[in-house]
Structure formats: structure tokens, C-alpha cells
Amino acid sequence: MWDLLVRGGRVVDPASGLDAVADVAVRDGRIAEVRPHERGAGLAAEDAAEVADAAGRLVTPGLVDLHTHVWHGATYWGLDPDPIAWRTGVTTWVDAGSAGAYSMDGLRRFAAELARVRVHALINVSALGLVAETGEHHNLDNLDVDTAVAVAARHGGFVRGVKARIDARTVGRHGLEPLRRAAALARRLDRPLMVHVGYGPPTIADIAPLLAEGDILTHCASGCPTDLVADGRLTAPARRALDAGAVFDLGHGSGALAFDVLEAELAEGVRPVASSDLHARSVHGPAFDLPTVMAKLVAAGAGLPEAIAAATVRPARALGLDAGTLAPGAAADIAVFDAEEGRFPVVDVHGSVRESPVRLTNTATYVDGRLLPPCAAEPPPPWIPLSGSQRRAEEDRVGATRSAVRRLESPEDFDEPFPRAGS
Ligand SMILES: [Zn+2]
């Protein structure tokens, strides 16, 4: 007997090499069996307590977003993941440096443990984390490696790596010293280092020599660094980082996706992780959510299965997470989408437009085999500027949420008696 059977969808699970019409059975919060239809009949509906018909839909592992900011109510960038997860299929959220040593305990207790989704963290090398818009490295007293090691040790597997924003504004006059300390911290924890790149200095040529195999270069398709891609080719330092085993991660955010850079990287053989860098300033656009970022990756030339790999198995492996697959025994984190085919315009942060041949609209999201309930987001905090169209979209969303509540008041609503307690 199964608790849930997701039947007849196109199941794409790159970790298992599966792309076929199949049934997915769940028992005790775990994937119990996945049976492709070509191997005979599907799984029997009678054997399941609940059956979800996914015919004509796309079924993937719950998506894994490698770069997000979920320390809401405590930082400049933070947002609550649950109001976004249920409508996007993202079941694993990696918070990228919102908390440093001083607030890791708070991120865990007041954001991660209260969320319905899975949350992991990268510890910021600055003990201040991302409480403010920038400047966390301006006072090096806050970048104490011993303190960060001690805090990370208390949090075991919750802390999956280290984060450092390395751009001119964030490092101030300290140049590469914040990066050196972040690298030292990552080596001592034996975990990957995620480096945010932007307007330098430091440049990619400065940063790349400090990256080790498995470290993550986030904002990899940003138009901001001047020496990431040149004349449609990876620059020598970017090529060196790639060849040394650095993971290239999109980290779309509010300013880090340029189609010309991404297209050059794909042509050069980069297979990036698709992450949203979702935060209070990117959730209303231009990133919106991870399925939108995946559609942009497809628009830039990657196939849909490749985009799914970039948002499931690849980010999971980058941090050694037990997520991103529908293999039997895995946690039953499942995303179901309407994968509409057509020509859908998508835009990068510089206003360049491409057409995606697919648009992903999430129709159901399960964590541990349980359907995430719809849930409305809080209004954006006062320091987040919204454009006129972003404000109107926000008002529409609030209005639609209110009008979703229907009273039972027409005569047909009373054609049978309401159930009474005890009857
Ligand atoms: Zn970020």
C-alpha cells in the first residue's frame, strides 16, 4: 500500500537517467517505486491512499535552489520560502550567506526549522552576514575564521559551505583579504566555498587562483565582471577556474544574468547550476523564481532535461545534499509542472530578450510526500523599491488571494445538508 501515487506524467530525473512516462509511488515520506510505462502496466491506483493524475504533465524531483536568501525578518535580503515553494516546486533552499557566525543559530531556529521546505546554509565569512545591503567586509574584525569554524561545528550538516561576496563595494579597501579568509574557513570546514562575483576589483583574475575543486562561482553569467567572458569566449582566468573543477552557478538575482555571457559560456561547454538568488529584491522580478530561471537557461540554448539537471542533481551534488532525485529510497520531494510549449519571451537583467520554447508552471509540490498548501507572501519590506508594474502585480496577487475565498450562499450550496459532528 502506498500513501501517494503520482500517475502518468513525463518523469524527468537526471540523477537516475530517467526521462519517460512513469508512475511514482510514495510510502512513509520516501520514494517507494518509479515504474516507466514501457515496462508494462503502470502501478495500480487501488494500492494507493491518494492518487494524483499527472497525465500530460512534467514530474521532476523537488527542485534544489543553490543560492537563495531566506533569513526573513532579520536581514535586508531575506524572504520567507514557503509562500514561494508551493507554487514553484522548490523543496530545498540553500541560504547563501545571510547568516554569519553571530546569527547562524537564529537562521536555523527561526527560519529553517519553521519552514515546510528544507533549508540549508552557507555560513558567511563575515559574522555580520547580510543584515545590510552591503559592507559586511568593511571591518575585518568581523571576519574571524576561528569563530566561524566554532559556530559551523555546532551546526553540523546544516552548514554546507561558506559564502563570501567579493566585489568592490563589499570588500571596501580590503582587496582580497576577505576572500583569503573565506577560503581558509572553507578548507578548515572541508566544505565548498561559494564566491559571489560582481563589479571588481577584485577581478576574476584575482579570484580564480583562490578557488579549489568544488568551489562555486556564483553570478557566473553576470554582465558585471569585466574579465569573465570576452569576445564571446571564456577568459583565461575563467577557463582556469572551470578546468580546476569550480562549479559555475547562475545566481540570477537582481543583477546577474546576461544572455550574451550565458550563451558564450554554454558554447564553451559550461554546464551551470541554475539558481535564482531569490531575495526581497529579485522575487518581484527580474528573477521571479527558479522555474523562470530554468526557462531562461533553455532560452539560452540548454535543453529542458539539461535545465532540470541544473536545478536538481547538480546543485545537490555540489553540496552533498540528500535531495534532487526520485530514486527509490530518496525523500519524496516531488514537483509537478505544466510544461507549456510555445514561444515565451524572457528577459535578462539588461533588457535583452530571448524566446523560451517552454514555460514551466508548477501545479503541485510535495515535501516528504505531503502536498504543500497554498500560502500568500507578506508584503515587501519598506526598503525594497518596486516599479509601477511590480506594484500592480503585487496588488493583483493580494486581490486574487482574497477573492479565492468563496462563501457558500447560493441555493445549490444547500442541496444537501452540511455534515454534523457525530453524523
Ligand atoms: Zn545572493
Regions found by a protein language model. Give the residues of each.
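C-terminal cap of metal-dependent C-N hydrolases
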Residues: A331-W383
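Active-site core of metal-dependent hydrolases
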Residues: A164-A264, E268-H284
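Metal-associated gating/positioning segment near the N- to mid-region
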Residues: A54-E113, L408-P417
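Divalent-metal coordination cores built from histidine and acidic residues
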Residues: P83-I166
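Divalent metal-coordination and catalytic microenvironments
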Residues: G9, V24, G29, G56, ...
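Active-site metal-binding motif and surrounding structural segment of the metallo-beta-lactamase
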Residues: R39-T60
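His/Asp/Glu-enriched, well-ordered alpha-helical/loop segment
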Residues: D260-E340
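N-terminal metal-binding scaffold of metallo-dependent hydrolase/deaminase domains
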Residues: M1-A44
